[in-house]
Amino acid sequence: MTISVSVRQVVGPEDAARRNTQGLRDGFVIEALFQPGRANLTYSHLDRMIVGGVVPAADRLVIDRVAETGTQRFLDRREAAIINIGGSGTVSVGDKDHVLGFQEALYVGMGGGALGFASDDANAPALFYVLSAPAHRSCPTVHITRDMAKKLSLGSAEESNARTINQYVHPDVCESCQLLVGLTMFEPGSVWNTMPAHVHDRRMEVYLYFGMQEATRIFHFMGEPGETRHVVLKNHEAVLSPGWSIHSGAGTGRYAFIWAMAGDNMSFTDMDKVPMEALR
């Protein structure tokens, strides 16, 4: 099969503050995630999160052994969450098939076995976004629809940040070891995400931006509050966020994003808010 794995080392705040644009992208941005007929994985040393894009074309794709994990099988010591942001497709866990429509998710517990991916229509392929973190126990596999997700409305039109957070892998929806995963949608005219900003030193986070027109761009802000930087992202690009960094963005047009966290706790509200006067 066609699978690639890249490794990202940890970048500290002092190093990040000295980097130019390409240096920031090399350290934090994940490009070309979704390529037809390929499974592209990025192994980040931030809480050992694996971020992947799987696009089955005519042939089924399988993730079973990833040498970088040091285990016989990918899920021997890991859990995973998979969200489909493309056409309808099927994810196989061991010998059981799960059909995922657009914006439907599958949580797979530790020891679930090989993961198989197939598209219903190769001309409108599924786009499977894969997130995986180390696990210490097995939790049940759960198929999660958007209706099942816990809804949280935040922001306002006046602040240009009215949005709905759909919590997919969350203690109130789906048992997991440490993964937290959700999808944020915006009201028309709202462009800002995660502003006012915050940090959570106890957890890393990764954003995947999607649902964008070809010319739309996200100006994603990162860095320590007093040393902010930005990267410009297009559709289907992801960005890693260490615990010390803010993670906020504004779009030139409509967009959505998937967020995922791993770390010390599973409290979505455990964050250190950053006052506006602290941002530079």
From Swiss-Prot:
Q: Can you cite a GO biological process for this protein?
A: D-galacturonate catabolic process
Q: Name one Pfam family in it.
A: KduI
InterPro entries, A to Z: KduI, KduI/IolB_isomerase, KduI_N, RmlC-like_jellyroll, RmlC_Cupin_sf
Cofactor annotation remark = Binds 1 zinc ion per subunit.
Q: Which cofactor does it need?
A: Zn(2+)
Is this entry keyworded Zinc? yes
Q: EC number(s) per UniProt?
A: 5.3.1.17
What is the catalytic activity of this protein?
5-dehydro-4-deoxy-D-glucuronate = 3-deoxy-D-glycero-2,5-hexodiulosonate
Q: What class of enzyme is it?
A: isomerase
* Annotated residues for binding of Zn(2+): 198, 200, 205, 247
Write out the GO MF terms.
4-deoxy-L-threo-5-hexosulose-uronate ketol-isomerase activity; zinc ion binding
Q: Which domain of life is it from?
A: Bacteria
UniProt keywords (A-Z) are: Isomerase, Metal-binding, Plasmid, Zinc
Pathway in which this enzyme or protein is active:
Glycan metabolism; pectin degradation; 2-dehydro-3-deoxy-D-gluconate from pectin: step 4/5
Query: Which CDD domains does the entry link to?
Result: cupin_KduI_C (cd20491), cupin_KduI_N (cd20294)
Protein family (similarity comment): Belongs to the KduI family.
Which NCBIfam families does the protein's record reference? PRK00924.1
PANTHER family the UniProt entry points to: 4-DEOXY-L-THREO-5-HEXOSULOSE-URONATE KETOL-ISOMERASE (PTHR38461:SF1)
What is known about what this protein does? Catalyzes the isomerization of 5-dehydro-4-deoxy-D-glucuronate to 3-deoxy-D-glycero-2,5-hexodiulosonate.
Q: What's the protein called, per UniProt? A: 4-deoxy-L-threo-5-hexosulose-uronate ketol-isomerase 1
Q: Which organism is it from?
A: Rhizobium meliloti (strain 1021)
